[in-house]
């Protein structure tokens, strides 16, 4: 240090200069001209869809065409997909993910072309090697279904006097298939519900890790396609870390279409002004194995990249990505940016939507370049737009057929059908795995509520690879008087799940997994694809959306060749209840995928740990009050939400939900809410319902009416502090002459599945007009539907004053939420005292409305 006190230190600056090296790749032999012709036909077909339906996307799908065609037709030996168009959902096929979902017209076009090639070859030869089930295939008639609903398509031909038109004869096979605006997992080879928010791509890490965990052959892979704008989203940014953390290696291969063009503007130079925003370096910095291409609209470069990924070292556990420069609005018939007739090619964000008028100048220029290439002539396109619906449909189908007639030229259709059969025959029906692909372990009867061990037990777990054995203690039910909160039971139910299913319950939670008590659920520690494939606890960062997406990726896979049986894993992701909305969007998309899936998939779980106002202890402000209620925002019957208050509710309630989900494909999500504090385990011998498995019924009676006294109404309780304090207040309320029925609300979804006689005995519909609620939740979402008009006025909720709580100690927060014992006593006492007046008010209101 100098005399005046100054000093110098050394700091370091990171450079933004690119560090990319060139390497030569031996281009494999492949049918380039065939791929180019299929690519041109694909582009023309998707443009016909846009032209006649006047909707959809144009620039992105055309930019994707070389990626999609090459990945499907280059062949497994060159790094292309191993798939079978005839059995598109075969469990042992490679997974293709059109994550950039609005680009799906390029796949609809390609799938129609493939379906037509096989259908024509089968018709010509009668050889069943070319037979594809029309129920799964796509055909020319499906061009009428682009962006139309299934209901409308059932009557579209009759409504337009086309039912008997020769052009529409194909509809008689199985109708017209609805082609959605974004990619969905129902679509042939596609295995993702894709969209522009990056949600689709984010599940890819879980899909890849699933194969490693199942001990599958390393040749099985995931190929996912997305664009650079979607990959700026939070989901996909977290996906970068997810894939690296799971060390998926070359099993995961992303093809990035980089054209610096979004919906409205450019990314670099507009959204990001500085040209230092370098995508390849970003992915490399995250730990990915990055390949860049100067022109990903060139088939040689795309196939070279696919081959390079295929030949890469399997010991390199970095996931792989190709950052390929494309042209949004790419057109194979354009020359130096010009189309026939001196029309300038439309590219970049201006080409995003299909915005050209029907049969307008630009469409005609595109069509003429196709006509010149293949020697065909489209009908009616030079006569202007078609306003009559019947004539428009006729012209659409006519010109789709003309475009597809290219398959009959120069042996293109023969080549394509043979190529599809050749690739399809490489899908292995008997893939070696470390697990039985024919048995669903979640149907094991040891998981039924009635068969759960009611006492603490020690089981012997055996490592399925090494044969090592170890004792595991599991306590699904605690003794009354023990001091344990509901969160303490979470690891116990996961341990039992993994013991019974032999390590098929996967945990994907952040580095607070110990805090939310999922840590010991894995019997064999952390998963690693090289050193510990039977571990079920994944290393994960604090990435709620990414973790949930990875969990969904796991559950979306199945080993079963029977589409009605799921053989795979279930998964759980969790965090503090306040943060779980970050997990909602991936699970919302998952719910729809589960609903529509052509094959059974697994069950995804969300743990809303530290829920309720109790989370705000230690003066924290992240309350789990409103946030966990997003898990009610699903179609009824597709999610089971469990809100536990007592340790002994957890196993009974959860395994009741699991029993349903394992047998009802509609249920794809189970949500569990647990609070942070430890409470004394309740003595159920003092309850009206003494059944130790009462939580399995959803709602159960803690205190029933005294039959010898006037009834004062029903108190429905949900949440930990609320119910614990209510139960402890009951003796004082009884001394005060209060005669209420107290119902514990664990899960309305479970309650709704009980016999009508049980529901009427616990909470009949009429009782809802004489009901108050005590809950750690809010007045915005009640634990039971159909509450009476005065329920809100008399209930206790954490948002009683419509304000955010301020935090403090646990006691401070509960008092502020008006869920302390004194507040509960006063509220229930008032509810009882005003019973007659309350009922009279409702009767008067009803009579007044009726008069």
Predicted regions span which residues?
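N-terminal capping segment at the start of a domain
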Residues: 39-55, 257
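N-terminal leader/propeptide and maturation segments of large enzyme subunits in energy/redox metabolism
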Residues: 124-127, 131-133, 137, 359-362, ...
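Active-site nucleophile and cofactor-binding loops and adjacent substrate-binding regions
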Residues: 53-65, 96-102, 163, 168-171, ...
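Cofactor-binding active-site loop characterized by glycine-rich and histidine/acidic residues
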Residues: 27-31, 35, 42-43, 47, ...
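Non-catalytic terminal/interface segments that mediate subunit docking, oligomerization
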Residues: 406-600, 688-722, 728-729, 734-738, ...
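Thiamine diphosphate
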Residues: 149-190, 199-203, 213-223, 232, ...
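A glycine-rich helix N-cap at a beta->alpha junction
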Residues: 116-129, 244-255, 285-288, 590-610
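Glycine-rich phosphate/pyrophosphate-binding loops
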Residues: 80-85, 211-223, 556-582, 602-604, ...
């Amino acid at each position: 240090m100098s005399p005046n006190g100054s000093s110098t230190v050394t700091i370091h600056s990171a450079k933004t200069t690119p560090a990319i090296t060139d390497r030569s790749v031996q281009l494999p032999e492949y049918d380039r001209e065939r791929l180019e012709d299929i690519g041109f036909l694909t582009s023309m077909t998707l443009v016909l869809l846009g032209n006649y339906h006047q909707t959809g996307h144009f620039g992105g799908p055309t930019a994707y065409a070389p990626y999609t065609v090459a990945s499907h037709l280059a062949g497994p030996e060159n790094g292309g997909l191993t798939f079978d168009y005839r059995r598109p959902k075969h469990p042992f096929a490679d997974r293709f993910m059109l994550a950039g979902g609005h680009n799906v017209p390029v796949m609809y076009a390609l799938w129609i072309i493939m379906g037509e090639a096989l259908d024509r070859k089968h018709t010509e030869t009668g050889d069943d090697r070319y037979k594809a089930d029309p129920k799964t295939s796509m055909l020319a008639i499906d061009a009428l279904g682009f962006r139309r609903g299934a209901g409308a398509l059932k009557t579209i031909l009759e409504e337009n006097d086309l039912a008997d038109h020769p052009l529409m004869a194909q509809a008689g096979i199985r109708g017209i298939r609805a082609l959605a605006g974004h990619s969905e997992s129902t679509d042939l080879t596609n295995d993702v519900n894709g969209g522009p928010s990056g949600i689709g791509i984010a599940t890819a890490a879980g899909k890849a890790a699933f194969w490693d965990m199942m001990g599958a052959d390393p040749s099985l892979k995931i190929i996912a396609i997305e664009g650079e704008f979607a990959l700026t989203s939070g989901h996909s940014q977290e996906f970068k870390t997810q894939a690296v953390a799971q060390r998926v290696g070359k099993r995961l291969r992303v093809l990035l279409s980089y054209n610096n063009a979004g919906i409205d503007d450019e990314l670099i130079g507009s959204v990001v002004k500085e040209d230092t925003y370098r995508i390849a370096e970003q992915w490399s910095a995250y730990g990915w194995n990055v390949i860049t291409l100067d022109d990903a609209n060139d088939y040689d470069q795309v196939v070279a990249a696919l081959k390079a990924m295929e030949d890469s070292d399997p010991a390199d556990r970095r996931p792989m990505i190709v950052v390929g420069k494309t042209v949004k609005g790419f057109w194979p018939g354009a020359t130096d940016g010009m189309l026939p007739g001196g029309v300038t090619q439309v590219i970049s964000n201006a080409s995003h939507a299909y915005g050209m008028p029907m049969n307008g100048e630009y469409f005609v220029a595109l069509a003429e370049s196709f006509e010149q290439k293949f020697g065909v002539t489209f009908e009616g396109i030079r006569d202007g737009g078609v306003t009559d619906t019947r004539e428009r449909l006729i012209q659409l189908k006519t010109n789709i057929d003309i475009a597809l007639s290219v398959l009959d030229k120069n042996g293109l259709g023969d080549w394509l059908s043979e190529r599809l059969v050749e690739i399809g025959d490489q899908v292995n029906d008997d893939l070696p795995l470390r697990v039985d692909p024919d048995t669903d372990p979640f149907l094991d009867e040891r998981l039924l509520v009635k068969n759960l061990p009611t006492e603490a037990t020690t089981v012997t777990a055996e490592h399925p690879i090494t044969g090592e054995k170890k004792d595991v203690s599991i306590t699904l039910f605690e003794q009354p008087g023990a001091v344990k909160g509901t969160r303490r039971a979470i690891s116990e139910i996961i341990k039992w799940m993994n013991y019974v299913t032999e390590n098929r319950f996967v945990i994907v939670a952040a580095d607070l997994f110990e805090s939310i008590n999922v840590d010991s659920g894995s019997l064999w520690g952390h998963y690693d694809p090289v050193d510990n494939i039977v571990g079920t606890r994944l290393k994960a960062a604090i990435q709620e959306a990414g973790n949930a997406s990875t969990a969904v990726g796991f559950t979306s896979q199945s080993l079963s060749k029977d589409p009605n049986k799921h053989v795979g894993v279930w998964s759980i992701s969790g965090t503090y209840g306040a943060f779980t909305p970050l997990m909602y969007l991936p699970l919302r998309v998952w719910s729809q995928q589960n609903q529509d899936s052509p094959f059974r998939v697994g069950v995804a779980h969300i743990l809303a740990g530290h829920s309720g106002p109790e989370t705000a202890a230690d003066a924290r402000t992240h309350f789990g009050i409103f946030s966990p209620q997003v898990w009610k925002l699903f179609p009824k019957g597709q999610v089971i939400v469990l809100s536990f208050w007592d340790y002994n509710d957890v196993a009974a309630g959860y395994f009741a939900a699991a029993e349903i989900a394992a047998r009802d494909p509609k249920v794809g999500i189970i949500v569990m809410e647990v609070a942070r504090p430890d409470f004394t385990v309740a003595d159920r011998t003092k309850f009206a319902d003494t059944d130790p498995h009462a939580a399995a019924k959803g709602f159960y009676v803690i205190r029933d009416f005294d039959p010898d006294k006037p009834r004062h109404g029903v108190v429905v309780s949900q949440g930990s502090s609320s119910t614990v304090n209510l139960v402890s207040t009951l003796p004082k309320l009884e001394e005060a002459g209060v005669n209420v029925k107290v119902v514990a609300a664990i899960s309305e979804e479970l309650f709704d599945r009980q016999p009508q006689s049980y529901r009427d005995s616990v909470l009949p519909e009429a009782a809802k007009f004489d009901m108050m609620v005590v809950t750690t939740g809010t007045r915005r979402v009640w634990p039971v539907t159909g509450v009476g008009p005065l329920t809100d006025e008399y209930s206790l909720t954490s948002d009683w004053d419509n304000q955010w709580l301020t935090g403090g100690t646990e006691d401070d927060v509960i008092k502020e939420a008006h869920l302390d014992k004194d507040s509960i006593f006063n509220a229930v006492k008032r509810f009882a005292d005003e019973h007659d007046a309350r009922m009279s008010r409702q009767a008067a209101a009803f009579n007044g409305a009726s008069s």
